[in-house]
Amino acid sequence: MSIPSILRKETLKKKDKNIDLQENNINDLVVSASRVIAPLWPISTFAAHHPWMGLEKQSFEQVANWLKEARNVDIYPSASMIHSAKAKGEIEESFLQIALSRWLDSQSFHMPRETAERFCQEALKLERLPSSLLSSPELNKLAEEINYVNTGSMKDSSMQPISSLIENQNGDNLSDILNYHIIKWCKLYLDDAGASWAMPNREKGFYRAWQHLITFDPALSKTERKVLKDWPEDALIALTKALSELGISESNMQAYLEGHLLSLPGWAGMIRWRSQQSIEEQELLIEYLAVRLSMELAIVKPYLPLKNQKVEKKVSIVPLIASWIYWGDISIEKWLQMSATEQSELLAFAYRFDENTRKKLWLEAWEQTHAEQLREKIASKQRATHDKKRVVAQLAFCIDVRSEPFRRHLEKLGPFETFGIAGFFGLPIATTELGSNDSHPSLPVILKPKHQIKELTDENECKSYEQRKMVGSSVRYTFKTMKQNVLTSMLLPEVSGPLLGLQMVTRSFVPRRVGGFIRNLRKNMLQKPDTTFSLNHVHDTNCEIPIGFTKEEKVNYVRQTLKMVGLTEGFAPLVVMCGHSSQSTNNPYAAALECGACGGAAGGFNARVFATLCNLPEVREALSAEGIKIPDDTIFAAAEHKTTVDELEWIYVPELSETAQEAFDCIEAIMPNVSQHANRERLMQLPHFKTKIKNPSKEAHRFAEDWSEIRPEWGLARNASFIIGQRELTQECDLEGRAFLHNYDWKQDESGDILANIIAGPGTVAQWINLQYYASTVAPHYYGSGNKATQTVTAGLGVMQGNASDLLPGLPWQSVMQSDRETYHSPLRLLIVIQAPTKYIERLLNNNFTFREKVQNGWVRLASVDPEGRWKNW
């Protein structure tokens, strides 16, 4: 078999078969093509998502190879990341050897095993081939001699937009010009907050609004405007016509649409998210593609037809030969002495053991090292014996990794028991705070709210509160109006300069004091009166979802949550539901530090609603009849864990029983110590601190109030595992704030439904968070959002670099990097550890096809710990 045919065969093996055109319908093609982008939520409700959620039917390896080929995006850790991790002891060499041996066993080759192993061992050092070798005349002459047959071996890459293949007379790529225009139109249409003048005809939809304006666009030439002058009024017809006139064959249409969606994945992701929010905009992605391809046609029409619209990349055998010379110790003289069959065998092997394969093995070794270290921590805890202490209070925290250190110190310093559960506490609600007409879905973005809960108070108190709020709103509105008005904007610097100048100086030099003063002033002015909730079911035809709960629903949600964490008996005198929130200043990514389980909002509202439900006599009576007996002196309260300063703020404390009051006083007494310990542990991870911190709480507050601080906290960086089991499994284990912790008692889950719900809900959210951090670390230029210091907040939607970039979809550099050269986040795929018998895991995988697919395709890793403490990797 010839060298080209062998390489072509290997290419087809590695090719990601993401395109399989079956339908002629453009609607179906757009839906299929949209899998290559992920919905992008507005930054104000920043929701974790992973960019490959539509591609999970393929393996992680296939998607990695496809992205490398189609967009030159590498989603495996870089060589520098791998070397750094190895130097820090995060990668055991033995696991790399196991991964290599497993890979070699899966391959078919006829050379001696020792030869293959020696080549791989050298290649795994991840050294670049010397440029002097690659450019040497002897090597290139050898490549020409070996390539004695027609080198028809091609990498059939995805079809690129025609505009990306053409440059104008100034040397500018037409795809860059097209992107500039599309960004401008997207900003105009999607703006919900920034512009004083809305886009004309916006209510008619993106395409129609664009069509009314495009022929007046001075940024287009007269010839380009002429092409679009009599363009169809229907977006679908326009898209079909553009594809036809661009000469895109039916078999290439989906690939072509994918190429355009991947050109600006941020803006396309925002468009896709908007299309999922309302019936009126459900065709928005079609409209976006119609606008984009119509404009592409206008820009490239003078250059049509092109001779070859499909990019074909030949596989160069020069680096393949060079790799055997450099890593396999096969000289040019030896190459010339080989037969064609032997040469083909070596080249095919080098082609298979490419850079992606090498990095894949390193990643697997890195992940296995982490899994083994976690197993040893859990095993050492199980071997130790601890006396069961009397518990005076039980506190339920969100599964968020930032809760783990706080819980650990809390349990160590006092007679407390903690639980982990998704921070929306199983309540599928949309919340409306006092004095607001807007509701916010306070649950994971993968779910839809079923109930609306309003915060209520006495009518007179409400009016007084609204008047106080209106004062602040009026000042902000006046400032914004003056800033955006043509005439008053020139006067604004004179009017506001002294005040804003004073704010700048004080915020910069004494941030903690000024921040505390402003926060206290705001708190005093906007002090909420005592409030209640609209908990009882009310049928309102003006609301899309019902207000409040029926009695059965109240009981059901409380029962479901208590069973999910295994808290159905042994209640302490005080049970505290702890939501969490963050505290930072001048931070566009503030929502990213809030509760992901509450849709990028604080979790206190849900915690308070749930605690209130648990205190209702009707709920307790119904639960008692089912065997869940909550003692009369047990009181449920609610608090909010402030993750930036590691403090617990009480938000709902009803009248307490005597024993509950004692527990409350106990928590209050030790909380300063808990905050000090948790803050010290967290702050020492920040790059600013290398020595002992005298006053951790004071420093934490400074970080929270400093408006120049680009890293008030690490957020969920370094997350690596999701442990589902009883607290005894990990109690007193220092998990370094890297684990999501969800309580689960398999003995109370005979049907397996509770475990299935944990995997489908919190498990999915944890996976999305994990892969968003992963993507922002390994490919920050494509999936991250760059440097916070140079970002521009755009249209109230997200951030850009400058004023004409893609809408940046991921996390900023400061969220994942320790410095310019050192990462902080370890890019590992999430390890899900379940404490349950083997048959529970088998049943879960058999019944949950989606989860089984994620495990098999390498999007998550799975391990279990059986009742005897035995660890099993799945």
UniProtKB/Swiss-Prot annotation:
It comes from the Bacteria. One of its GO terms (cellular component) is plasma membrane. This is Probable inorganic carbon transporter subunit DabA. The gene is dabA. Forms a complex with DabB. It holds the Pfam family DabA. InterPro entries: DabA. GO terms for molecular function: zinc ion binding. Its main location: membrane. It is a peripheral membrane protein. Its cofactor is Zn(2+). It comes from Bacillus anthracis. Belongs to the inorganic carbon transporter (TC 9.A.2) DabA family. It is found in: Cell membrane.
